[in-house]
């Protein structure tokens, strides 16, 4: 495994985000499998929240699906790196504030969310919505 992914894995265990992700996967009834680059893929998560095809807590990628596409895994891997850079749990309020700001300025939770943009909107399957004040009449 690449050194940067080993660092990310260790950092996310130390900052407790990966243990939190593992706990969420257990509570959510997900089946855990080793993934690429030190990720842990948790399939069959049973809860409807959060509303996303997949979400990442530490190095744990949780999904209700039974498989994930390569691009989505790359996207979620970038979120795992964000957890490490945010030193773990501070990622939660930072992400929520970023999501709220995106909703306010364009009406979509991901389009202007800095975390989703840095993880690549296209790889995550998110649209690129225009800002409210830049929309022409009749566009939505």
Task: Locate predicted features.
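Metalloprotease/metallohydrolase-associated module, dominated by Zn2+-dependent proteases
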Residues: 1-37, 41-45, 49-52, 87-140
